[in-house]
Amino acid sequence: MADLIKETRVENGWVRGVAAADPRVISYKGIPFAAPPVGALRWRAPQPAKDWEGVLDCVRFAPISMQCKPGTDPNNLYTREWNVDPEIPMDEDSLYLNIWTPAKEKDERLPVFVWYFGGGLMEGNPAEMEFNGERIARRGIVVVTINYRLNVFGFLAHPELTAEAPDAPTNFGLLDQAYATKWVKRNIAAFGGDPENITIGGQSAGGRSVQVQLTSPQTEGLFQKAIIMSGIRYGSYQGVNSHGMNRTLEQAEADGLDFFQWAGIRNLAEARQLESHTLMELFRNYAGIGSGLGPGTKMWAPVIDGTFQLGHFSEMILKNKRHMVPLLMTNTSSESWEMPQVQTMAELETLAKERFGHRSGEFLSAVQGENLAQTLENAKYCPMELGMRLYFEATAAEHPELQNYSAVFDGDIPGWDHPGTFHSSDLWFVFESLASCWRPFTGRHYDLARQMCSYVSNFIKTGDPNGKDVDGSTLPEWKSYSTCKGQMRYATPCKQLDDLSVSPVMRFLTDFYLHQIG
């Protein structure tokens, strides 16, 4: 039997991996995909990595990108969940990627999965314990997790930057993602991967990133499928529609000027001379991170720069101005619910007229209950599910042949804190990495994780999540959205939901926004 690929050559030199915990998989950690973005390359588009001599041992994760480390506060759900090591190495030199491959031969042409981590484009890293690519790789997939620039390092805009490089004035973190994915396309055959069968995926801000990549003219033909987890919010009773989370270049440049003035930075040259930790601390104080929202809270949003991002990514997707590849979109059952903030029926009627105009009566009929409390409960909806429905309805109108899939994670999450299916809780299951979590998961949780990982792996392979589980059994049928208008319910057991499960208010909102979009 052939050995696994423990040593191989990429465009800049030889790399050596090491057996993962599962000896059927080889991992390569810390492969440089671009030059260090330091000095004169700070706030520049990623540049080619330099060649190295000999064989590069890729046995440990590279430093994480510059960020405010969340620490290990036991009273904070997210720091408790991911247990981020406060001593983890952090450096501006962070443009590296990690690969898990089960291939025995370089010509196997296995499907490829490229993962963009979340964290609000402010924090996060591919070394988080839930992102272990081993279990997906065991299913015959080459898994790649990438690092990219964040916060002020990844999304600063400034008139001097625009004058210096008008073709890449900002969005450096998004450019890193695209550059890494292009590196994968050029080099993944060396690890037994198929450069013509790449799926990109991400969760939260990683899911938003996937949407930007889906709509960028610079990524045409780069990937064949995409997975978006908890990455889109649409609609709000409060009138603040967060579906775009974009800035124009002019707005972003104004933010950059404001930051420089606040920090006492005279010009771009001076900013590039600042030590990275000093710059990070200045930005933390400017943005009010850790002490409420400050003026910098939009500085890590994608920017409509006219080159990489041509418009609001969600609006472009809703108008089918995207790469028309199959999508798999998911959300969790407890995250991001919206409910009208009113105290009386009269206030609700006023809100309905403000939000829905001449269709306010339809809305009120859809949510009507025996009393105010029941009516407000009927008005609850998940903006992430609404965003998915709008995306898929828009696709079906012009591309009925394209099959898209949706799921809601509704598994029970054990633990003394009784957290529900909180935002990001599904990551342990999709990567089947429950054993790394502190929570007292039992057999049914491991069964669900196995199924979810198999569904996702099947989609990565073929664009269809249906097929065999890793244990050889046939997975419960998952119908495409165009077939049933419903989601797969990730739970014990997994169950297909149909159109009848959609609430009246969700039906109304979907129709209302589709007509509004035009």
What are these regions (language model features)?
Residues 68, 73, 90, 389, ...:
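Mobile gating loops/cap/lid regions near enzyme active sites that modulate substrate access
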Residues 191-203:
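Alpha/beta-hydrolase fold nucleophile elbow
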Residues 82-87, 166-171, 238-247, 369-382, ...:
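Active-site rim elements
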Residues 94, 166-189, 249-254:
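Alpha/beta-hydrolase active-site loop
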Residues 121, 202-212:
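Glycine-rich nucleophile elbow surrounding the catalytic serine of serine-hydrolase chemistry
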Residues 200, 227-229:
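A short, hydrophobic beta-strand element of the alpha/beta-hydrolase
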Residues 186, 212-215, 220, 229-230, ...:
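Substrate-access "cap/lid" subdomains that shape
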Residues 1-171, 195, 333-336, 441-452, ...:
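Non-catalytic accessory segments of hydrolases
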